[in-house]
Amino acid sequence: MWNNRVILSGNLVRDVEVKVTEGESGKHVANFTVAVQRTRSKEDAVDFINCVAWEQVADYLGSYGKKGKRIELEGRLHTRSYEKDDKKIYITEVYVDDCHLTSNKNSNEEE
């Protein structure tokens, strides 16, 4: 049973870049943002959702994830915090388990 499940459909805000973590394991990670159109809103509002992908998913997005590309993803909410100037900063992001790139926002092409 899924207690923490997120499904999003939106557009990549910029090209996805993959980095390698420090240390012996050197895992591939991609941090990216998805622009998601709000539904049921009287105004044309967009939410910008921060996402993180690891290993194979990160590599896939690094190869094909370009600015404006349509993405459908499934994952889970993840929260973390850190200290800055004696203040605790909280971050909420989506850890991506699976994704599919479809087309650019103004295109009918399929990936």
Where in this protein do the model-derived segments appear?
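Single-stranded nucleic acid-binding surfaces, predominantly the OB-fold ssDNA-binding core
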Residues: 1-111
